[in-house]
Swiss-Prot record:
InterPro entries assigned: AAA+_ATPase, FtsK/SpoIIIE/SftA, FtsK_alpha, FtsK_dom, Ftsk_gamma, P-loop_NTPase, WH-like_DNA-bd_sf, WH_DNA-bd_sf
Biased composition (Low complexity): 464-484
Residues annotated to bind ATP: 654-661
Keywords: ATP-binding, DNA-binding, Nucleotide-binding
Coiled-coil annotated residue ranges, if any: none
Function according to Swiss-Prot or TrEMBL: Probable DNA motor protein. May track DNA in a ATP-dependent manner by generating positive supercoils in front of it and negative supercoils behind it.
Ranges of Pro residues composition bias in the record: 375-385, 395-406, 449-463
Superkingdom classification of source: Bacteria
A GO term, aspect molecular function: ATP binding
Other notes: Although strongly related to FtsK, it lacks the typical transmembrane domains located at the N-terminal part of FtsK.
Protein name: Uncharacterized FtsK-like protein DR_0400
Amino acid sequence: MRRLQREIRTYDEEQLKQVREELTTYDLMTRNALLQTAHDLRAKVEQEAVPEGEQATTYLKAVVDDRRHELSVFLPATQASAALENVRRHLVNQILSIGGKAKKLETERCAAERHLKRPTVEVVQREHDAHLRRLRQWQEVQSRFQTWHTYEQAYARWPDLAAAFDSGPTEAATRVATELHKRTLATMQEQDRWREFLRQATEQEHQRQLTPPEDDLPEDDLEEDTWAAAESSEPSGSLFSRLGHTLSRLMAPPGPDEVPSAATAPRETDGWDDVQPQIAPDPRSTVPGLWDDADDLTPVSPVAPARPAPSPPVYDAAAVPALDIDFSAAPRRSRTPAEQMPDPFARAARVRSARRTTTPLVPVPQQLDAAEMPAPRPARTPPGRPATAGNVAPPSAPRTARPPSPTLADFDLWDDEEDMPFGPPATPAPAAASVPQMVPTPRAAARPTPRPVSSPGPSPVPVSPASASVSHAAPWEEPAAGRPAPAPSGVSRRGATRLALPSEQLLDPLPNGARNTVQMDLDAERRGDMINETLRQFGLQAKVVDLARGPTVTRYEIEPAPGEKISRIASLSNDLARALAVGGVRVEAPVPGKSVIGLEVPNAEREPVTFHQATANPAFKNTRAKLPIILGKSIDGSMMVGDLAKMPHLLVAGSTGSGKSVCVNTLITSLLYRYLPTELRFVMIDPKMVELTPYDGIPHLVRPVVTNPADAAGVLLGAVAHMERRYKMMSQVGAKNLEQFNAKMRAVGEVELPHLVIIIDELADLMITSPKEVESAIMRLAQMARATGMHLILATQRPSVDILTSLIKVNIPARIAFAVSSSHDSRTILDTTGAERLTGMGDMLFYQPGLVKPLRLQGPYISEAESARITDELRRMMFDDDFIEAYGADFEGMISSSGPGGDRSQLDFSDPLLRQAALVCIEEGQGSVSRLQRRLSVGHARAGKLMDLLEAMNIVGPHQGSKPREVLIHEADLPEYFGK
C-alpha cells in the first residue's frame, strides 16, 4: 500500500486523469455486471415456483377456509369410519403443512423480487443463496403435494363405503379398519374390491342367521311329557344342574350321517382363539374363505378351516344358540316374528320355566385353592366395540387341550360371560357318572389385571423375577393362611440417589403445535390489510411492509412515507385497537436496527410455550452463559436465554395473575437443570409462604425457606457478612472474582465456593416489616456481591416507588415487567411505558444493559406437577455438604422474636433435647443451628429455639454474624445446669 501511495505521488495531472477514467470505467463495468446479475437472478426467482404450490394453496383454501371439500366433513366414531377419520385428519394436517409451506415460500419469493429491484452486492449474494434454498424447498413441496394428491384421490367416496361397513357385519368393519391402519393407500385404491367383499360378507352373515344347523335343534312339537320324563330321569340338584343335564342331552354328538356341511358347520374352537389382546377379531377367521391371501380380495367359496378333526367331534359353545331363559316368576312374553327369528328353544324354555321349582344355590366357599382356580382369560369385547385397556386382559399361559368327551364338561358354557350372571365354575366337572352342580363364582376372568403404575423418574426400580412370579389373589379374596399379602403392584420404594442433574423425563411431554397455524397466518395478513385501510382513512402515508407472528403477539412493520412523522402514527394506537377489535396495541417506534415502526397486536389464539420446549431448545442446551436462565420466546420465534452472571441481579415485577410467580419458578428450575448443589446454592425468602416453600428440602438450599419477615432481615444481613467473608478469602489468594478463586482452589485440592443466588419472592412485605435493614442489605449485595458469585432475584407485585426505591433500582439494572395497571407502574419498573399494554399470562418486557429498548417475550409455563416431580427427585439426592459445614452459620439470622434478646421468662426450658444440644455444642467446640439440625435430626425452627435456650442459659455466646457462636462451658459443667 505504501508503495502504491509513493507511486501515485509521482503522477502528474495527465496520469491522474487517466487513472480516474480507468476507475470510472471499472466502476461502470462493475455496476453493469451487478445489474445484469440481478436481472438474471430476478428472472430465475420469478420462475422458481412450482405449479404444485399454487394447487396446494387452492386445496388449502377449499379444505380449511371454504370447507367445501370432502376432507372438511368429520366422520363418526364408529369402527370403519373412525379409522377413516384418522386418515382424513392426517390428510388435512398434511395439506395445512404443505399449503403453509407454499405460502411462505411464495411470500419470500415476492420479497426477493422487490429487493432485487434495487440491487447491491450484498443483496445479490444474499438472494442468490436464498434462491437456491427455496428451490430445494419447492421441490420438497412438489413431492409432498403429489403424494398427498394421490391419497386425496383415493379418499373419494370412501366415507359412504365406511358407513356401509359400519352398518354391516362387525367382522367386516373390523377388518377394513385394520387394513386402513396398516395399508392406507393400497386399501383406499381397492375400493371396488372392498365393496365386493362387503357384499359377500353381508350375504354370508345373513345366510348364517337364517339357516342354523337343523340337526342340532329339538323338534318344534316337543311335548310337555317328554320334558317331564327328562326331569324325572335327571338327578336332583339346582337349577343350573338340571339345565346343564338337559343341554348335555340336547348337544350329544351327531352320527356320521348327521354332520353338517362345511358351508354351515361352526368353527371348532374353544371360543378364545380369535380374541386378541388389543386388536379386534380378524375377519380371516370369522369369514372363512374371503381372506385366504392378504393381497387378493377376490371372494372364494367358503370352506371349513383346515384343522385336524377330533374323534369324536367336539362342538363349540359359541355354535349353540343362546337360551332365552327368564328367571322371574311370570313367563317372558314371546317375541313376534317381526322382532326376532323364531326361536326353536322358546317353547322348551317356557315349559321348563312353568315346571321348575325354587332350589337354593350352593354357597361359594370363602377360600379357593390356587390349583383349583381356573386360568384367567382375556375379557371378550362386545361386538362393534373397540378393545380398550379396560376390557382387555394380558395374555395368559397357553391352554392345554382337553380330551374329547361327550359329557357336559367338554362344552365351554361360560364363553359369553355377559349373558350369564356368574363366572366359570371353580372346580372341573367330575366324570360322566353324575351331572355336576354348577357353583356360581365371582367373575375372575372378566376382571382385567391392572397395569402397574410406574413412578415418574429417570431411574425406575427394577422388579426382581422372584417377585414377578408370585401369583396374587383376586381383589375380593383374603390372602391364604401362611402367605403374606402381596404389595400393591406399581408401588416401588425409592431410596436415596447420587447427585445428578434432573432429567427431562420429569417434565410434561412436548405439546403439539397449533393445528391452525395456516389459519393464524391468514388472519395476520388480513389484519395487515385492515391496518393499511385504517392508516389510509386517517390520511397517513404509511403501509405495512412485513410482519412477524409470535406466540402471543404479531408485530407489523409499518414503513412511513418520506416526511411522515412517527408521532402521528403512534398517536393512533387506540384507533388501531378499535379497528382491529383487540384490547390494545403497543407501538414500538422505531424498531431497533430497522427504519420501520413496529405495531404489536395480540393474537386471537396463543401458541403454547412450555418449559420442556425451552429446555429442548438449542439456545439453552448450547449456551455458554455462566448462569443461564430461560426468559421466554421472542416475537421472531427465537428462545431468549439470559445470563444471570452478566446481569448481575434481576428485578421481576407485575400485577397479580400476570405470570410473575411462574417466571420465578422458571428461573429457579433453569438453574437446577444446569448446576449441582456443589456448584450452585440458593437462599430463598418467601413471606407469602406458598410460592417458594415447595422447594424446601432440596439440596441446593443453604437453609430452609425463610417465611418470617422478621427473620428475613437477619438472613440478608448474614448474606452480607458471608459476602465480606468471601472477599477476605479472595484477597488472601489474590483472586479478583469467583472463577479465579475456584481455579486456585482446584489447583491446591481445596473445596470450591459455589455460586449463590438469593431469591426474594415478595419484596413489599420485607420493606414494610424492616425497611432500613432490608434496603441497606440489598443495596450492599447489589453493589458488591457480583465478584463473589452472589446474585439477587427480587420479585414484587407492588411496583410502587416506596417499594422499588431509587437505591434498589440503580443497583439492579436488569428488569422484567409483566402486565401492570397503569403507565406510572410501567415507568417505575422499566423507566418507560409499555407494560400497561401487555396481555398477561406470561407476556413480559425484558430489559438489561446493552439493549436499546425492552424486548417483548412470552415466558414459558411450568406446571406445579412438574415442579413437584423435580423437587421430589432432588430431595432424594444425598452428598457431603462441605459448604454448610463451613459457612452454614453465616445464614442463621434471627431465629425467633422471643429469643435471648426478648423476654426470657417466656422461654420453655423443658425441651428433652436441651441437654443433648448442649453436649453437641461442647463436642463441636462451637454453636451452630445447622449442626444441631443434623446431629439431632430436628427441623430448623426447633434447632434455632434450642440455640436460643442455650444462649439464655449462658452455655453459648450471642450470635456474631458470620462467625459461629462461642461455647462458654465445658462438659464437666453440665451437671450444674441439668443435674446428674
